[in-house]
A protein has these predicted regions:
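N-terminal cationic-hydrophobic initiation segments that often serve targeting/anchoring roles
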Residues: 28-32, 56, 107
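A structural signal for short coil/turn segments at secondary-structure junctions
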Residues: 34-35, 59, 110
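Conserved nucleotide-sugar donor-binding
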Residues: 73-89
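Conserved donor-nucleotide/metal-binding helix-loop-beta segment in metal-dependent transferases, i.e.
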Residues: 46-77
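Active-site-proximal specificity loops/subdomain of glycosyltransferases
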Residues: 1-32
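Short aromatic/basic micro-patch
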Residues: 21, 79-80, 97
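Catalytic core and acceptor-binding pocket of nucleotide-sugar-dependent glycosyltransferases
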Residues: 87-229
Length: 229
């Protein structure tokens, strides 16, 4: 650790892109040491609007992640079944690339047995996108936010822009164009939960739950609402 700090002190944000990959080795060490299985890893700017214990993942034996285009993974939320699978994935990493590129590359290894994707878009919509973005939607009847919804609704990291207000930001890397649709907040029990309004291919309006938001702006408070009495 100390050697990495010294080596990267002059890099972008003190080695930001190196640390984003290093975290997975730290998670691996933790899982091995304490014999931990079936964990959900979330970045600290990700808000989850569902009790994790109530989410039945479609393949509890595989590592599940979000891809926002054919080749890029945004690992803000990831289900990791066990240390063995995580380790096999990390063996494939090219440390000249960042974590988003590496996870995307591992996913695309021919006949790889370790990874499947979580849906970031519904299967039935006006947009035609890769099945990578919609696979297993029917299992959840909900979508996960890789990054673009949180960026659109809440803006981006202020360190990345000179604009004070970046709400409405459109992530051009993401193949699904969320800015074409409306969003609303509905109470589930005492808590408000985000939903996307999107027509089906036949024109019927779908109101689709969003399980998490990747709040890139780091301003999580804007999405914390008073509990419904």
């Amino acid at each position: 650790y100390d050697a990495m700090v010294a080596a990267y002190q002059n890099d972008f944000r003190n080695g930001f892109w190196h640390w984003t990959s290093f975290r997975f080795y730290a998670i691996l060490a933790y899982m091995k040491k304490y014999n931990i299985t079936q964990i959900v890893h979330v970045e600290n700017d990700v808000m989850i609007f569902e009790n994790i214990a109530n989410i039945t993942f479609h393949r509890p034996d595989k590592l599940l992640l979000t891809m926002d285009n054919e080749h890029r993974c945004v690992p803000g939320l990831m289900y990791i079944p066990n240390a063995h699978i995580l380790e096999q994935c990390l063996f494939q990493f090219d440390h000249k690339q960042n974590d988003m590129q590496n996870w995307g590359n591992v996913y695309h290894i021919k006949d790889q047995p370790w990874i499947e994707t979580l849906p970031i878009a519904p299967k039935d919509s006006p947009q035609k996108v890769s099945p990578i973005l919609t696979n297993h939607y029917e299992h959840y009847n909900s979508i996960f936010d890789a990054a673009s919804i949180g960026q659109y609704l809440g803006g981006i990291d202020p360190r990345n822009s000179e604009q004070k207000d970046t709400k409405g930001f459109i992530n051009t890397h993401c193949d699904f164009k969320y800015h074409n649709y409306d969003f609303t907040w509905l109470y589930e029990g005492q808590n408000k939960v985000p939903y996307m309004k999107i027509p089906s291919s036949t024109g019927n309006l779908q109101i689709i739950k969003i399980i998490n938001l990747h709040v890139h702006s780091k301003n999580l408070c804007q999405f914390i609402f008073p509990q419904h009495s």
